[in-house]
């Protein structure tokens, strides 16, 4: 079983990888306008991956916090609600489909 520190390190590593990939795609799209259209699918996949990571990180925080995470004053509870809000706020049909792919894999 991972410790809280190990879980946090794993999630952070995944975050840094997603961030690097997102910046690389943005740089590619800004350098070549034709590539901007070509990277739409990749950017949608990255957004879905980021939403999935956010949800898993919030869930890990709730799990690490224990029963107190359900209190309205809890930071973990607030993060969990925010993660769920971001999962549905402003999603396109393509992003919703990609997000469902992450949730069902």
Where are these regions (language model features)?
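Catalytic-core signal marking the mid-to-C-terminal active-site face
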Residues: 27-49, 58-60, 64, 76
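Generic serine detector
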Residues: 10-13, 30, 65, 73-74, ...
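Extended aliphatic helical segments
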Residues: 4, 40-41, 62, 69, ...
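Short amphipathic alpha-helical coiled-coil/interface segments
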Residues: 8-15, 43-58, 80
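Functionally constrained cores in energy, signaling, and assembly domains
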Residues: 22-25, 43, 54, 64-65, ...
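Extended amphipathic alpha-helical segments enriched in small hydrophobics
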Residues: 1-34
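Charged/polar positions within long, soluble alpha-helices
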Residues: 16, 20-23, 27, 55-63, ...
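Glycine-rich phosphate/cofactor-binding loops in nucleotide/flavin-utilizing enzymes
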Residues: 68-105
């Amino acid at each position: 079983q991972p410790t809280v520190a190990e879980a946090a390190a794993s999630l952070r590593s995944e975050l840094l990888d997603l961030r690097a990939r997102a910046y690389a795609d943005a740089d590619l799209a800004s350098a070549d306008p034709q590539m901007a259209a070509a990277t739409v699918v990749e950017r949608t996949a990255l957004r879905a991956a980021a939403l999935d990571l956010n949800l898993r990180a919030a869930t890990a925080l709730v799990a690490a916090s224990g029963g107190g995470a359900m209190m309205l004053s809890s930071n973990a509870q607030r993060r969990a609600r925010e993660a769920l809000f971001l999962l549905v706020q402003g999603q396109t049909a393509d992003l919703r489909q990609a997000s469902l792919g992450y949730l069902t894999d």
